[in-house]
Amino acid sequence: VWLLIEVADTTLELDRGEKLPAYGRAGIPEVWIVNLPELVVEVYREPHLAGYAQRRLARAGERISPAAFPDATVEVGALLER
């Protein structure tokens, strides 16, 4: 697994509080949480035992790329459309 994507509308507490630390412990290198209520994509990198060392917020109008595939860009606004 190079990238795991969670789409969260009502599950943000579960995704951040339980799943994210578990993904970090499992060594998943990158997690994106598509945060629909706040209209951002939370990008987590650098896994460790407690979660992730790096967190970045990306908003509509920005482009993001998985660290493992930097040439594959995604328009954040497209991920946030309902």
Regions found by a protein language model. Name each.
Residues 1-26, 33-82:
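C-terminal interaction segment
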